């Protein structure tokens, strides 16, 4: 089980990413476009650098939705490998069966 502070930090980062996503995308588009004036590009780089560090999606971590475990998360299910196995063996995941051949 992840510490509550880590889950709260992740939630705060998700909120910041969502809040600044449009502005960040617009600035990155300006920076990447080949026809952008160099002065405008430099200003866009400065504005991008002024955005909060935690508003970058790179700083998000995939976590288990139940207990917050940060590693071994199966993206398709949002569960860690440990939790996935437990729930699958108990029959709590529809359509998931243990392989047998």
Curated annotation (Swiss-Prot):
Cellular component aspect of the GO annotation: small ribosomal subunit
UniProtKB keywords: Ribonucleoprotein, Ribosomal protein, RNA-binding, rRNA-binding
Residues forming coiled coils: none
Keyword Ribosomal protein annotated: yes
GO molecular function: rRNA binding; structural constituent of ribosome
Keyword Transport part of the UniProt annotation: no
Gene3D superfamilies the record matches: 1.10.287.1480
GO biological process: translation
Pfam family membership, one: Ribosomal_S14
Subunit comment: Part of the 30S ribosomal subunit. Contacts proteins S3 and S10.
Family according to the record: Belongs to the universal ribosomal protein uS14 family.
Function: Binds 16S rRNA, required for the assembly of 30S particles and may also be responsible for determining the conformation of the 16S rRNA at the A site.
PANTHER family: 30S RIBOSOMAL PROTEIN S14, SMALL RIBOSOMAL SUBUNIT PROTEIN US14A
Protein name, UniProt field: Small ribosomal subunit protein uS14A
Protein source organism: Salinispora tropica (strain ATCC BAA-916 / DSM 44818 / JCM 13857 / NBRC 105044 / CNB-440)
Gene field: rpsN
């Amino acid at each position: 089980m992840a510490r509550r502070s880590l889950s709260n930090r992740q939630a705060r980062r998700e909120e910041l990413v969502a809040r600044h996503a449009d502005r960040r995308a617009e600035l990155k588009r300006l920076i990447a476009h080949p026809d952008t004036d160099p002065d405008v590009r430099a200003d866009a780089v400065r504005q991008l650098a002024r955005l909060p560090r935690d508003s970058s999606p790179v700083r998000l971590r995939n976590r288990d939705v139940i207990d917050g475990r940060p590693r071994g998360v199966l993206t398709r299910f949002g569960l860690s490998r440990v939790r996935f196995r437990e729930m699958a063996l108990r029959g709590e995941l529809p359509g998931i069966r243990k392989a047998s051949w």
